Amino acid sequence: MISDKNFAIRLTDVDVCFYVRETGAVSLKEVLFSLGKRPFLDKKFVLRNINLEIKHGESIALLGKNGSGKSTLLRVLSGIIEPEKGKIEVNGVVAPLLSLGVGLEYEMTGQENIKLLCALMGMSQAEIKNYTQEIIEFSELGEAINWQVKRYSTGMMTRLAFSIAIIKQPDILLIDEVLSVGDVGFQKKCLKKVEEIKAKGATIVFVSHNFNEVKSMCSKGVLVNNGTIDFIGDIEEVGERYSKLF
């Protein structure tokens, strides 16, 4: 539930880093002294000094080249990735629609996944029962809803994940590229549903390489480049700056 704070998401001085194995030669002495200890690791910053505030009801596009950090930023907003430092404040119920299949249990059927994920979203058994048929109908999976998810194509996983994520009006909807998978008809259906969610006052954060799609959905953009925020502003201006990166 939304409180009286005037923002949906606020990030203050956020850094995110990953630890990777060092490259290059390692001396025999270093190897011997490291036995039984943590392997040699390099600290690689993926995001640095991120400051961003998104207000309730805003529709924001995250734009940037591959590897810029925009998808990592979306995962930070969803709570999947913890920052190395900094503060993250989220004011509302978040529905993340990120990488294909994330959150789905592959050994379970589609219908079993509906029950599981709806329960994890905080729904009561009565709500789950009421929403299940609506989810199945929106997904257009038909009899495949009784298959194990490991038999699904990527498009079928997208249908199921999206249908579950949007069944209840979220306060904040996070979308990362996944709507580009599957047939055009279902993509249009999903975008129409996102527009309906937006019209009811939800905050939308959208990552896509399709600028026309982004422009129709979002009025504001954030340009992410080399792990930092280069620019925040009107979507047209952000789009122009984005195009100059290539």
Where are these regions (language model features)?
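Conserved ABC ATPase "signature" C-loop
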Residues: N226-G227, Y242
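Conserved ABC ATPase "signature" region
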Residues: K29-S34, K115, E127-A144
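A short, surface-exposed alpha-helical micro-motif characterized by mixed small hydrophobic
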Residues: V214-S216
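The feature captures the beta-strand-to-loop junction immediately N-terminal to the Walker
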Residues: L63-K65
